[in-house]
Amino acid sequence: MARFWTEAPHRHGSTARTGILLVNLGTPVAPTAAALRPYLQQFLSDPRVVEIPRAVWLPLLNGVILNTRPRKSAAKYASIWTDEGSPLAVHTRRQAELIAARFASRDDVRVDWAMRYGAPAVADKLGALRAAGCTRILVVPMYPQYAASTTASVMDEVARCLQHWRNLPELRFVRSFHDDPGYIGALAASVREHWTRHGQPDRLLMSFHGLPRYTLERGDPYHCECHRTARLLAESLGLAPERVIVSFQSRFGRTRWLEPYTQPTLEALARDGVGRVDVMCPGFVADCLETLEEIAMECRAAFLGAGGREFHYIPCLNERPDWIDALERRVRSEAGNWLTATPPTDAEREAARGRALALGAAE
């Protein structure tokens, strides 16, 4: 097998298109143990996600975890599954469709979406953009805060997918948008709207996905970017520091992770007499297992069970128009001159094609 793939013949005078690929983490195709096993195997085999030496980790993963965890995880997914499928896939697809609608008048832009793990695969969607004539691709990892285990993993996967292409596209990545004014503004608006309907809580808890503490110690900026997001959001809401709490959820294994942990924090608040807490997850732009099941179900039960009176979960941004506006602005800013340059006219393209054919070009 050839190391580099054979490309379609280059056609002179063709339109140069820009591809925009939104990439989120991933989801199984069904809430079943059979579907969870390959998904978890791909996810937990990524050395960006689990930094334990392969010789130690892979036997544990394949011999123990993949024989026990899929069934437990399937039950959790089943509790949030919708008629349209996984909430994360549904929201990510809708976000891509809404961004595509913003560029509907342009023949030189294509918008699509993929998942880092599971389907639709990054490789398949990059191939589709190539087939559509995209010679420039902006990859948008849908993680507001950069982490090596999320954003960098998307970058790794794109590089892996392109290693066999002969005719490579221009590439750009959105590294993070944790302090983007539009993103912060949309978060603040979602909180204000919730409080207009339900009143204000005693505490607002912002729960971010956790990471092992050693990632912070080894220079990962994720922890700092989470706290910057929280500070900017609290300032936008005009909240005193004592009313805002930052915590980290989804701890896995026995290693020390970023602290404080979300569920124990909620239980402690209830025991200390905090009657109502509102929880939001600014690190997720789409509702998913970690928000709908872990926070809105498990953590709700833990808080109320510890003596809390009222628990409110404020949904992720999902398809909020102000968030889609912010995402569009970010895409346009990161794509830059790809979208602002004046494309050649039909006459100019035909002239270029004519010159190439006169010099002996086949297409």
UniProtKB/Swiss-Prot annotation:
Query: What SUPFAM superfamilies would the database entry show?
Result: Chelatase (SSF53800)
Give the metabolic or biological pathway: Porphyrin-containing compound metabolism; protoheme biosynthesis; protoheme from protoporphyrin-IX: step 1/1
Enzyme Commission number(s) from the entry: 4.98.1.1
Q: Which Gene3D superfamilies match?
A: 3.40.50.1400
Kindly list the places in or outside the cell where this protein is found, as annotated in its UniProt entry: Cytoplasm
What does the UniProt keyword field contain?
Cytoplasm, Heme biosynthesis, Iron, Lyase, Metal-binding, Porphyrin biosynthesis
**A single GO CC term, please?**
cytoplasm
UniProt-listed InterPro entries? Ferrochelatase, Ferrochelatase_AS, Ferrochelatase_C, Ferrochelatase_N
PROSITE patterns, per this entry? FERROCHELATASE
Q: What general EC class does the enzyme of this chain belong to?
A: lyase
Enumerate the catalysed reactions.
Answer: heme b + 2 H(+) = protoporphyrin IX + Fe(2+)
The GO molecular function terms of this record are:
ferrochelatase activity; metal ion binding
Q: Name one GO biological process term.
A: heme biosynthetic process
Q: Does the keyword Lyase apply?
A: yes
The Swiss-Prot or TrEMBL record describes its family as follows: Belongs to the ferrochelatase family.
Job of this protein: Catalyzes the ferrous insertion into protoporphyrin IX.
Q: What is this protein called?
A: Ferrochelatase
Species name: Azoarcus sp. (strain BH72)
Give the source lineage, highest ranks first: Bacteria, Pseudomonadati, Pseudomonadota, Betaproteobacteria, Rhodocyclales
Quick one: which gene encodes this? Answer: hemH
